[in-house]
Amino acid sequence: MENIKRIYLSALVHNRTGVLLRVAALFARRGYNVVSLTVSETESPEFSRMTIVSDVEEYKISIVMQQLSRLEEVIKVINLDEGQAIQSEILLIKVHALNKDRKKVLKTINSFGARVMDIGHTTITAELTGLPSLIDKFIDKMDKHGICELSRSGVTALESGDRNIKEVE
């Protein structure tokens, strides 16, 4: 089996209808699985930033980047190595919390620095923002209480330091 690597790509694209479809279609046609995808308008409304997380065979990383760069709507693509990127993700999670368990659930929520968003009769909903690894650990802990449902935003990332995507060659 080939050496699979998780890659974090940041793409600056024109903010136009159909761009997301073209990027997703490229990944689907090539058989690349998208683990996480976030898209949002940038500081300039004419552009959007896509953060694409994918598990790719190591030798295909540059190929994926070249294929993305060839799309007309894509202005620039950079590979955000973990050490060179600021990453964050948001989790909303609803867990079972009967009266006898509420203190334990709240203690777990507080120990991770999460926020309580809602308390129902039998559930507690919390929000946690942080690295994907922190989100994963929190989910593991909350699983002991019984997860009703959860939603993850997907990873969003920027290059660390002073450079920005427009300056990267």
Feature-to-residue mapping (PLM):
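Long, contiguous binding/interaction regions
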Residues: 1-49, 53-169
